[in-house]
Amino acid sequence: MLKGAIAQRYAQALFELAVQENLDGIEAELQELVQCVEQNAEVAHVLYHPHISLSEKKDLMNKIFAGELSVTVRNFLNLLIDRRRQNYLMEIARVFAHLADEARNIVEAKVASAIPLSETQEQRLHQELARMTGKNVRMVKEVRPELIGGVMIQIGDRVMDGTVAFKLQRIRQSLSHA
């Protein structure tokens, strides 16, 4: 089975449970868990090392996160370990966050520009994206000087490229085919 499909199934199961219990709390704990694993090499070593037994992994993870994570998230982590799916944790967390955003009617827009946008430009862009999508928009901004000017926006798999660099590329292509 593909990694994405496995992560989707586990994320969906946890999401359905979280909706019944406490979506915001479980999402925050899952992100905290991922952050801890990413930032702490010892925790990552224990979680991912193939020669540490499953029971040792579960015991150590339960001790490390006893006061930090709810029983629901600790049980979910134990399930991943039991089924040898802990390597999917990061992807599961990413899919879970996407499901939570969908439930809250939030869409993420990645906005790249050559220079930082002014507050007025950000507000106008935010309003226009909300109007276009019919959803609440969370903008993730990135400054990329190589774009020369303009803005590139990505929402899901849709890209709107209004950058000077893109327009120059199109001019080059049309001149080379002329």
Swiss-Prot record:
Protein name (Swiss-Prot/TrEMBL): ATP synthase subunit delta
Upper classification of the organism: Bacteria, Bacillati, Bacillota, Clostridia, Eubacteriales
Compartments in which it is found: Cell membrane
Family the entry assigns: Belongs to the ATPase delta chain family.
Biological role stated in the UniProt entry: F(1)F(0) ATP synthase produces ATP from ADP in the presence of a proton or sodium gradient. F-type ATPases consist of two structural domains, F(1) containing the extramembraneous catalytic core and F(0) containing the membrane proton channel, linked together by a central stalk and a peripheral stalk. During catalysis, ATP synthesis in the catalytic domain of F(1) is coupled via a rotary mechanism of the central stalk subunits to proton translocation. This protein is part of the stalk that links CF(0) to CF(1). It either transmits conformational changes from CF(0) to CF(1) or is implicated in proton conduction.
Bilayer topology term: Peripheral membrane protein
CC per GO annotation: plasma membrane; proton-transporting ATP synthase complex
Major subcellular location class: membrane
Subunit and interaction comment: F-type ATPases have 2 components, F(1) - the catalytic core - and F(0) - the membrane proton channel. F(1) has five subunits: alpha(3), beta(3), gamma(1), delta(1), epsilon(1). F(0) has three main subunits: a(1), b(2) and c(10-14). The alpha and beta chains form an alternating ring which encloses part of the gamma chain. F(1) is attached to F(0) by a central stalk formed by the gamma and epsilon chains, while a peripheral stalk is formed by the delta and b chains.
Gene of this entry: atpH
MF (Gene Ontology): proton-transporting ATP synthase activity, rotational mechanism
Record organism: Desulfitobacterium hafniense (strain Y51)
InterPro entries with a match to the protein in the record: ATP_synth_OSCP/delta_N_sf (IPR026015), ATPase_OSCP/dsu (IPR000711)
Keywords in alphabetical order: ATP synthesis, Cell membrane, CF(1), Hydrogen ion transport, Ion transport, Membrane, Transport
SUPFAM superfamilies for this protein: N-terminal domain of the delta subunit of the F1F0-ATP synthase
